[in-house]
Amino acid sequence: MATITVVKARQIFDSRGNPTVEVDIHTSNGIKVTAAVPSGASTGIYEALELRDGGSDYLGKGVSKAVGNVNNIIGPALIGKDPTQQTAIDNFMVHELDGTQNEWGWCKQKLGANAILAVSLAVCKAGAVVSGIPLYKHIANLAGNPKIVLPVPAFNVINGGSHAGNKLAMQEFMILPVGAASFKEAMKMGVEVYHHLKSVIKKKYGQDATNVGDEGGFAPNIQENKEGLELLKTAIEKAGYTGKVVIGMDVAASEFYSEDKTYDLNFKEENNNGSQKISGDALKDLYKSFVAEYPIVSIEDPFDQDDWEHYAKMTTECGTEVQIVGDDLLVTNPKRVAKAIAEKSCNALLLKVNQIGSVTESIEAVKMSKKAGWGVMTSHRSGETEDTFIADLAVGLSTGQIKTGAPCRSERLAKYNQLLRIEEELGSEAIYAGVNFRKPVEPY
């Protein structure tokens, strides 16, 4: 049995130039693995604690405390442990070494979710190498998933909300090549639509409008949300993929929810007169009008993270034709997932490992979601690294969907390219989720 001999953390930088945590693990049989954690821009208030240093260095965003917690507390406690025992190691870190809890479970406020997760990811990678199997297969084994499926990529090609400097309230407009026969073909479709979209935007809004945002998407000076959908529809048509490439949205509505329980579609305009503030019901009806007019299959965070009422209404009214994805609502937290299942608040989980802070808890949230008949979309964060763990995670858990940005910017392509490698490695056994992206496998 190989055991952990070294756990070493350092501060590196994410794709936005902000510090983040990277961890190396060495084992007794000479293996060395490295894992790095991402960070988000629009973060849900219920996410586990991302520990930052504060102060003036790096504008308060340094992670030397989290790095110190790995090097001085977590690391020494893991020496001699077997890296294949993921659940035991995660539970030891979360319950014993950290031990902080709030009403939603283990909140990692002592050591930081970024410290614990970096180690959890590295342990998972080490466990795979020690077991002599690919990472995706190791993850499938940890979850008890017998059938591996490649996900449909959801490319975020138009950016608004907190990710962009335009007037657009809604944060992401995505394309999903569900009509492809393989992941490789899905990449081809996505890339071609992306380039057609670039031409359409350049022609309509000028060269500057094709500058890319944090996730590689375009942020043209669009005034309203329907304009974004219209651009996607045009680009899909020009690429010749009408019916094969469909649309998803991430509204990130918590970003424009007001104290008075209204949603301000003009929230980015300073000193605005409130003329575009609408009720939750009016916003729901706006989504329904979009769904009637465009090939929309997925809407993420359509309401505020505490607006359980409108989530449930929306899921009841359109949940069969559209997946209603909980991100800020659920924050990959098993307790919040359980509440949403009980209240029928949504019907899909957005899986972000750094919202909850360990591989084991992420697997638990996915298994609960699948048992409830939900879809699962694996996701990056807007501040990413070159780490490709989530590509293997999406395959190993057969989530059926992954969003990790546009087919642009190396930290995004790193994940898509890893999925191409995995598909090639699986050969004739490779299955692409395609139109079954919401339920690619039976619950495991």
Swiss-Prot record:
Protein residues bound to substrate: 163, 172, 300, 327, 379-382, 403
Places the protein is found: Cytoplasm, Cytosol; Nucleus; Mitochondrion outer membrane
An annotated GO cellular component: plasmodesma
This protein's pathway: Carbohydrate degradation; glycolysis; pyruvate from D-glyceraldehyde 3-phosphate: step 4/5
EC number: 4.2.1.11
CDD domains, per the entry: enolase (cd03313)
Residues given in the record as Mg(2+) binding sites: 250, 300, 327
GO terms of biological process kind: glycolytic process; response to abscisic acid; response to cold; response to light stimulus
Catalyzed reactions: (2R)-2-phosphoglycerate = phosphoenolpyruvate + H2O
Cofactor details (free text): Mg(2+) is required for catalysis and for stabilizing the dimer.
Keywords assigned: Cytoplasm, DNA-binding, Glycolysis, Lyase, Magnesium, Membrane, Metal-binding, Mitochondrion, Mitochondrion outer membrane, Nucleus, Repressor, Transcription, Transcription regulation
Cofactor requirements of the protein: Mg(2+)
Active site: 215, 352
Transmembrane portions of the chain: none
InterPro entries attached to this UniProt entry: Enolase (IPR000941), Enolase-like_C_sf (IPR036849), Enolase-like_N (IPR029017), Enolase_C (IPR020810), Enolase_CS (IPR020809), Enolase_N (IPR020811)
GO molecular function, one term: magnesium ion binding
Role summary: Multifunctional enzyme that acts as an enolase involved in the metabolism and as a positive regulator of cold-responsive gene transcription. Binds to the cis-element the gene promoter of STZ/ZAT10, a zinc finger transcriptional repressor.
Protein family membership: Belongs to the enolase family.
Name of this chain's protein: Bifunctional enolase 2/transcriptional activator
Taxonomic path: Eukaryota, Viridiplantae, Streptophyta, Embryophyta, Tracheophyta
Gene: ENO2
